[in-house]
């Protein structure tokens, strides 16, 4: 029977519900990083040796292998989920099959669990461009993935990427080998990544931000179309009238037609033309494309400084960005960061002057009401944007989650909730939790979960409380 949601503001009051508590209480630095895949698992990192996965379908927690993070766990630790997995391989954006058939892909990965229901994207080789649901897979060394039967057999020239969760975690304290690691869901492994290029010490508060192309059970396109022509380093759609440079640092993927499967970072854009690194196969007028967030980039901000860092997953390397305008002031305790890409206002969705996908919004925290945003395409900060009323301040203990047009905020450890309307630049009270929580601690343990049944979508906001094992959720009405 289809789900219907008859809840209405004023008529129906929002209610906080208690859900399964975690087995260990939150401490300074503890955080939850949300996977945006269809199962919506939540990674809870509580110390250098403790990590748990929350499954909202079952309302249950399970302990994971130790993160074995270097450093001293405290305020400043951060994590984020990416959309695409390369297993235990680092400095790569894809994997290569060892063989296969029309319905199987032989891998060199040791897959530890069933990936049925997740997806696999064929980047090049036979059947290039298709994104297929995983029917089943073998467990263990050199796992074999089964998909629906395709026109051609997969071979050792098949290049692919797994659409399964992978979490990137940055520890706190003095950085050393093991401070920056990834947890790969498919292989159930932690792998050390490079931290060269980051500050020597991580503290205060900080956030990792991803800009993935995949959301829930499909690609989240900012724009799409069919090319009218291309060169070795460009893709042209002469029917477009884009604002110059609006797509810089986004990503273009050839969905079908000539060059299908290829993915490139956009380095320049004009009214009709995207510039990219050299194509392996030059697209043409048959090439259907999508422009999305960039799967290769992670951003790190915080640490009591205005400096903004960017990590390349394919390069396993950090760089320090030099924005045209620097952030006006450093973020502090209780800061936030959210990549905004789902605003429904037409000003934001206009493809010729797109705003969705361009901005990372960040409340500064540190007993401040200020909010700034980083423009990804323009590589610049816009500081202290005007909104009303800008009277509530946020600091240690504040928790945030972004969904659609709004950023949801729990202030400090007061149980008071607010909802920041992004396109309207307005702050509203949301309600107050009638519960008791412990002392305020740095670390974001708030997230959102979607329930979907056909066209019906119901969103819940969850929060694991300050210095507590207790977790609650509330339906968005």
Where in this protein do the model-derived segments appear?
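Enriched but not universal
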Residues: 1-20, 30, 36, 472-477
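Residue-level signal for WD-repeat beta-propeller blades
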Residues: 10, 37-38, 45-46, 55, ...
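Predominantly a core beta-strand signature of beta-propeller blades
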Residues: 15-18, 60-63, 189-192, 317-320, ...
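Conserved short beta-strand element of beta-propeller blades
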Residues: 19-46, 51, 64-85, 163-173, ...
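Autoprocessing Asn-cyclization modules and mimics
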Residues: 22, 66-71, 82-156, 161, ...
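Residue-level signal for tight coil/turn positions that link beta-strands
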Residues: 40, 48-49, 58, 140-142, ...
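Short loop/turn segments that connect beta-strands within beta-propeller blades
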Residues: 56-59, 184-188, 312-316, 375-379, ...
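Short beta-strand segments
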Residues: 62, 130-132, 191, 262-264, ...
């Amino acid at each position: 029977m289809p789900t219907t949601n008859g809840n209405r503001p004023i008529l129906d009051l929002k209610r906080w519900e208690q859900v399964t508590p975690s087995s260990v209480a939150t401490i300074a630095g503890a955080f939850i990083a949300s996977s945006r895949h269809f199962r919506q698992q939540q990674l809870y990192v509580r110390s250098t040796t403790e990590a748990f996965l929350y499954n909202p379908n079952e309302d249950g927690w399970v302990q994971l292998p130790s993160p074995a993070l270097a450093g001293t766990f405290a305020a400043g630790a951060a994590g984020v989920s990416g959309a695409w997995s390369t297993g235990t391989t680092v400095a790569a954006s894809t994997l290569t099959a060892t063989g296969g058939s029309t319905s199987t892909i032989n891998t060199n990965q040791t897959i530890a669990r069933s990936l049925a229901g997740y997806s696999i994207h064929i980047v090049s080789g036979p059947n290039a461009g298709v994104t297929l649901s995983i029917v089943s897979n073998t467990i263990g060394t050199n796992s074999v993935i089964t998909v629906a039967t395709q026109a051609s057999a997969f071979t050792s020239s098949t290049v692919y990427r797994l659409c399964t969760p992978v979490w990137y975690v940055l520890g706190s304290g003095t950085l050393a080998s093991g401070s920056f690691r990834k947890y790969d869901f498919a292989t159930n492994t932690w792998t050390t990544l490079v931290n060269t290029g980051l500050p020597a010490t991580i503290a205060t508060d900080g956030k990792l931000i991803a800009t993935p192309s995949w959301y829930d059970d499909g690609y989240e396109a900012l724009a799409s179309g069919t090319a009218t022509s291309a060169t070795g380093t460009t893709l042209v759609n002469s029917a477009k009238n884009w604002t110059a440079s609006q797509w810089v640092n986004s990503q273009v993927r050839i969905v079908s037609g000539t060059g299908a499967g290829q993915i490139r970072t956009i380095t320049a854009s004009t009214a009709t033309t995207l510039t990219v690194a050299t194509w392996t196969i030059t697209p043409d007028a048959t090439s259907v494309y999508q422009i999305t967030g960039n799967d290769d980039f992670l951003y790190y901000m915080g640490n009591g400084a205005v400096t903004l860092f960017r990590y390349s997953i394919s390069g396993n390397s950090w760089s320090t960005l030099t924005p045209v305008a620097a952030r006006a002031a450093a973020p502090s305790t209780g800061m936030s960061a959210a990549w905004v890409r789902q605003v429904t206002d037409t000003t934001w969705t206009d493809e010729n002057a797109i705003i969705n996908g361009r901005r990372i919004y960040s409340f500064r925290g540190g007993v401040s009401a200020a909010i700034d945003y980083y423009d990804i395409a323009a590589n610049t900060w816009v500081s202290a944007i005007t909104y009303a009323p800008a009277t509530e301040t946020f600091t240690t203990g504040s928790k945030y989650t972004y969904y659609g047009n709004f950023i949801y905020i729990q202030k400090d450890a007061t149980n008071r909730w607010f909802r920041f309307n992004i396109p309207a630049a307005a702050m509203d009270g949301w309600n107050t939790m009638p519960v008791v929580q412990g002392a305020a601690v740095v670390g974001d343990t708030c997230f959102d979960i979607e329930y979907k049944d056909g066209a019906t979508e119901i969103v819940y906001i969850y929060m694991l409380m300050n210095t507590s094992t207790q977790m609650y959720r509330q339906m968005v009405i």
